[in-house]
From Swiss-Prot:
It comes from Vibrio cholerae serotype O1 (strain ATCC 39315 / El Tor Inaba N16961). CDD domains: NAT_SF. GO terms for molecular function: acyltransferase activity, transferring groups other than amino-acyl groups; diaminobutyrate acetyltransferase activity. Keywords: Acyltransferase, Transferase. This is L-2,4-diaminobutyric acid acetyltransferase.
Length: 173
């Protein structure tokens, strides 16, 4: 007799935590596996995991890095959080991890004063559009989209247009 509940064990839960400087290279390797995200230098990922620990988040499963959110407070608008990248390992996609990472990040006590979330997305990145549209719906559908960096004007045709998605957050994230 086959016992399906034994054959298909549920996945272990994700563990969310702040990155440390020691995580920089693992983050760099994760992002390399997460097309269509732009690969930044390993140095950049070390800075994200050390200088921006309070606004970045890692997700691990069985002590393996499966997700990372890089974000920062905008220098001139400290109550606005800019989400730079949301990376999910191919093995963890389609399970709601990206959304859970954003929710855990926004639930941090030291980010309780964040009133606006921003990100940029290229037209072709459908996974990111779905993710941020879901968050926008949850927050009352007050989000707006505008051109941030134009393919022709800013990138001379070398990169797709980046659209700025701005989502006002309700007081209880």
């Amino acid at each position: 007799m086959i016992y399906p509940q034994i054959m298909h064990k549920p996945a272990l839960p994700w563990v969310f935590r702040r990155p440390t400087q020691e995580d920089g290279l693992s983050i760099h390797e994760l992002i390399a596996q997460c097309a269509p995200l732009d690969q930044n230098s390993a140095y950049c990922n070390f800075l994200q995991s050390s200088h921006f620990q309070t606004t970045c988040l890692m997700a691990e499963q069985q002590e393996l890095l499966v997700g990372f959110v890089s974000a920062y407070r905008k220098p001139e608008q400290q109550n606005e959080l800019f989400i730079w990248q949301v990376a999910v390992h191919p093995s963890a996609r389609g399970k709601g991890l990206a959304y859970q990472m954003l929710k855990h990040l926004l639930a941090r006590e030291d980010l309780a004063d964040i009133t606006v979330l921003e990100t940029t997305i290229t037209r072709s990145n459908q996974a990111s559009w779905r993710l941020f549209q879901k968050l926008d719906r949850e927050q009352g559908e007050q989000g707006s989209v505008s051109t941030f960096l134009d393919e022709t004007c800013h990138f001379e045709g070398e990169h797709d247009t980046e659209y700025l998605y701005r989502i006002p957050l309700q007081s209880s994230n």
